[in-house]
């Protein structure tokens, strides 16, 4: 949270937040008002999805697309806008992804933060300290990074650790393949199992 709190502070009004449940299937309410708050933002952050939450793929695709979004603030007229933001979810519980289609997974990047700051390393309200002492340098770093991304046509090669994290997340999300590899003998071409029994074992 220190990392993203520092960035959001230097971005000012270009930063926006969104409730994490808007990005999951845990709520069924209309999301138009939530999406309306994204207009003009450059960075949108959602924090801490709950264990067991499932990603709402259709909402994610809308938010991470170049297609116009139709939104409406409460008691206001609806309007269209083109997304200009990068969406970030920082959480200890990666939400479940029910689909394995490329349309969803090409939008997902997993960046693991493995280091834990304890004892003297753990500085209270460190984001505020960073912004106060080095806010202009953080903003400069962001601008330089954006320029590099633009220069490379927005195709930036991810580090190996990020690629491994994405692949691991995708494998864990593909529950059918996981079930087949762990519970079924695929080498035995003569093996049979009643479909009802197979489905019950998969569900359990």
Regions of interest found by a model, annotated:
Residues 2-204:
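Feature primarily recognizes SF3-like P-loop helicase cores of small DNA viruses
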